[in-house]
Amino acid sequence: MDVFIHYTQLPEGKTLADVVGELNEVLDDTGVVCGGEENRLDLDLEDETVNPKFAQLAVKTYLQQAGFPMDTTLEIGGMEIGIYL
């Protein structure tokens, strides 16, 4: 399952490499950051082995705790969802 993180800026004091590394730690064996483009990170969640909702919740929690801006969204199945909703 593909999930996209749309953001306008990174949290203060974090580089893109920091965020990618931390997300890969959060996802552990349930997914991986697999690319992206300007202001977007692409994640591949392993829906065959684990309920993808757990990984989605872990990503959302990480983004909140890392201090991503209020307008950051997760795109899942073509729908964008705010991380603070």
What are these model-predicted stretches?
Residues 60-84:
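Conserved short beta-strand edge segments in small beta-sheet-based binding/regulatory domains
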